[in-house]
C-alpha cells in the first residue's frame, strides 16, 4: 500500500484483465488493503521487466497464501504508464482461474 501512496498519481487507475478499472489513489489503496487482509502471506518475484519511454512491462510470479491455508501461484504481467515519476495507469494480465477464491 505504501508503494501505491508513493508511486501513483492521485488520479491513477488499475485494471485487472478486461474488468473495469478502479480509479483514484485512495480507491487503489483501499482495494489493496482489502485484498491483503484475506491473505496470511504474499510472496512476489520480479522475473523480468522492460522499459520503453514512459511505459513499463513487468513479469511477476506470485504465491498467495490465504488465511485458510490455501496457496495460489500464478504469473502476471503488469503494464504501467508513467507520468513523470509516478504511475497513472496500470493494467494486470493473468489467468483469473488461478486466484479466484
PLM regions: where:
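Short, surface-exposed coil-to-beta transition loops
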Residues: 43-45, 59, 72-78
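Hydrophobic beta-strand positions in extracellular immunoglobulin-like domains
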Residues: 62-64, 82
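Short beta-strand edge/turn micro-motifs at domain boundaries
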Residues: 75-101
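A solvent-exposed, acidic/Ser-Thr-rich amphipathic alpha-helical stretch
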Residues: 1-53
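A short, polar/proline- and glycine-enriched secondary-structure boundary/capping micro-motif
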Residues: 26, 68-71, 99-101
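A short hydrophobic beta-strand element
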Residues: 51-62
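Short, cysteine-centered beta-strand-loop-beta hairpins and adjacent loop/turn segments enriched
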Residues: 38, 64-73
Amino acid at each position: 500500500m505504501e508503494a501505491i501512496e508513493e508511486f501513483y498519481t492521485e488520479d491513477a487507475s488499475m485494471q485487472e484483465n478486461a474488468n473495469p478499472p478502479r480509479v483514484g489513489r485512495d480507491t487503489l489503496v483501499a482495494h489493496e488493503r482489502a485484498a491483503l487482509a484475506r491473505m496470511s502471506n504474499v510472496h512476489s518475484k520480479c522475473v523480468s521487466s522492460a522499459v520503453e519511454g514512459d511505459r513499463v512491462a513487468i513479469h511477476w510470479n506470485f504465491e498467495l497464501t490465504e488465511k485458510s491455508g490455501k496457496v495460489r501461484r500464478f504469473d502476471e504481467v503488469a503494464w504501467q504508464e508513467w507520468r513523470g515519476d509516478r504511475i497513472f495507469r496500470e493494467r494486470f494480465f493473468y489467468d483469473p482461474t488461478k486466484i479466484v477464491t
